[in-house]
Amino acid sequence: MDVYQDIWNGSFPELITNPSVDRNRFFSSYMQTYIERDVRDYQGTTNDLKFYKFVRAVAVRTGNLINYEDLARDCDIDRRTAQKWLDTLQASGLVYLLPPYSSNLTKHIIKTPKMYFLDTGLACFLANIDSPEALEASYLNGSMLETHTLCEILKSFWHNGENARNLYFYRDANKKEVDFVLEKNMTLYPMEAKKQHCRAAMIVRIITFSKN
């Protein structure tokens, strides 16, 4: 299966196992239930329309550094509300915040986390991407591929009963960047998500180097 088909499908079992399910209706119902039940459990009453707009704003920024000012401006809310709402998305399992790698030897690095949607199918729905072909042609194809890669890495941790506390990304002030960095046994394992066009498949390039 082409990687963009896989990304667009997402990971909801109902959509994968039953092709007859109306995708748009499913995600619309999911978001309505999520806001009316889950979000109110975390933060009480909220402006549903603005919160939905906020979730969409996060979806089109998946794989990007958190910028509360941009989110607040686009959704006509203040920075404090943007931070509170992103915390809710994280706490409810809709979004994952990936921390930057840092050590005593890395002084000129970006210290802001990146935010990722934990289901790329839902992210595509919220971004109004209506097919795998539209996804591959869109400006979001790179960030969605990166998001998909992170989701697969996280699943490998969780399925083995492990957490991902040693997983990071790297970016310095000169914009040199590594998509993901795993720290294990005093060794860093940088990983880059790339599209292998000749076989329409996703590959992860892993380079190993010692912390020392």
Stretches found by the model and what they are:
Residues 87-88, 93-95, 99-212:
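A cross-kingdom feature that marks ATP-driven nucleic-acid transaction machinery
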Residues 1-60, 64-65:
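Interdomain motor-coupling "hinge/lid" segment immediately C-terminal to the ATP-binding subdomain
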Residues 65, 70-72:
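A short alpha-helical element within helix-turn-helix/winged-helix DNA-binding domains
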Residues 15-21, 80, 93-96:
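AAA+ ATPase "lid" subdomain C-terminal helix
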Residues 18-19, 41-46, 73-77, 100, ...:
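C-terminal helical "lid" subdomain and adjoining coupling/linker elements of P-loop NTPases
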Residues 47-50, 67, 78-81, 118, ...:
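Helical mechanochemical/support elements of P-loop NTPase systems and associated helical scaffolds
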